[in-house]
Amino acid sequence: MSPETQTVDGNDAISPKPLTFHSEFDKFLLLNILIQRSSHKEFPYLFGLHADLPAYNMNGKVKILMMNERIHDEFLKILAEELIPAMGCTEPIALAYAGARAREVLGCLPDRVIAYCSGNMIKNVRCVTIPNSESMVGIEAGVMLGIVGGNASKCMEVLEDLTDEDRKTAAAMLRDGVCTVEYLDSEIPLHIILELHKDASVVTLEIRYDHTNITKITKDEEVIFSSDHKEGGCSLADRSLLSVDNIKDFADQVPLKDIHELLDRVIIHNMNIAYEGMAGSYGLGIGKIIKESYPDGVAVRMKAYAAAGSEARMGGCDMPVMINSGSGNQGIASSVPVIVYARENNICQERLYRALAFSSLLTIYQKEFIGKLSAFCGAVSASCASGAAITYLLGGTLEQIKNTIGNVLANIPGTICDGAKISCAAKIATSLDAAMMAHYLAMNGRAYQADSGILQEDAGETISCVGYIGKEGMKQTDKEIIKIMLQ
């Protein structure tokens, strides 16, 4: 088992030998002995630079990898930026956040408010119940609740501390017609401009690209704050490093101490709202119907709990969700199925953490091409990531993981987004059906080949093409959807 030494650039370098075991038990026993009794210094050939455990596949051969330090650091930043708590559907919450921040600058309640909203903002606020509002719905309600009782320092949990008095005041101001909504003809899908008036004083606040990305604040024509952040500019991490290969390497090797606290919050928050959706009365009760109507099995429970969590969130449940890429539904769809699958199959917590890191980053990677809001349903991207993460969870090879992705995107790449609403839960269930079928096909060595429709030679190329269709090709589709919804 001693390592071979070779000379690289005049220096002795250690290169690993693959270790072959006669059984999985032998492998498990040896690895645990080495981990417990040795240090990185004593066995540098066994441990990767950042690895808790060697990455290994299921044929008994250990593959020792050295993770790029930059990838490690940047991917941790990406996860920290995108996996954040939010209470309620993120678009009305963005309006509430804008209202709360603008009111801070104004210094008092306004007597007139104008909310200019892009088409995608209108589409995604129109039908969802605002949390902690006692069933209020709509753009005006989101803005006024933020203005009256929002706490901007809590970002996407801005409405957490609303009181009965806040709700009464907001409702009275809504009845008086204090807030009006104007369509903002913008090429930026997520674009908000708020004007708050009080006597002769005016505060204007603008948000672009991301739900809390304030780009400009003025008071009485004086610029208080200005940022030139373009799309993606609000990210401090380098997203160009994202690829299926790099995501898998990161998930294999990242020290669990670097990710477990963040992913514990994902598990706790997203499973809590899934349980609430199953127990409570939200929407059509789709989770319970799925669980009771289909033959019992892990795939059915995955769909049921993920759909239930989405329906509760869309129905105004005030429990927080750990969102992904600005979306609670994507946060739920990329995590709950993986958690349910791991628990049902008694897969260890450490492996679950790695699968969740993989699923989360794969969702983010897909959304980098599509954008935060578009005519393309985000449930497809997140469910695709869950299916691929389950392939990863079961020790699937990189090829099998990529085939899972391709099998999903060969099937349901054209699902439209017609706004946030309770039927998003049904789209999650349907997308998970496709994701599990893709997983089963891949694990049985079956995959749709390149040139099958839009599929490309590599999964990353396919993801890029689907993103291009969602972001550019479906622009007119998005406009027609919004036009129909506003009729």
Predicted segments, located by residue:
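A structural signal for small-residue-enriched, beta-sheet-centric alpha/beta enzyme cores
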Residues: 87-90, 120-124, 128-131, 209-212, ...
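Signature of multi-pass transmembrane helix bundles
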Residues: 175-316, 481-487
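Acidic-glycine-rich active-site phosphate/pyrophosphate-binding loop
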Residues: 67-76, 109-122, 297-316, 349-366, ...
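Hydrophobic alpha-helical bundle architecture
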Residues: 102-105, 131, 341-354, 364-430, ...
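Conserved phosphate/anionic-ligand binding catalytic regions in large, soluble enzymes, centered on
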Residues: 85-101, 319-335, 378-381
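Mobile "lid/hinge" segments at catalytic clefts and subdomain interfaces of large enzymes
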Residues: 137-139, 144-157, 161-166, 170-173, ...
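Early transmembrane hairpin of solute transport permeases
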Residues: 93-192, 196
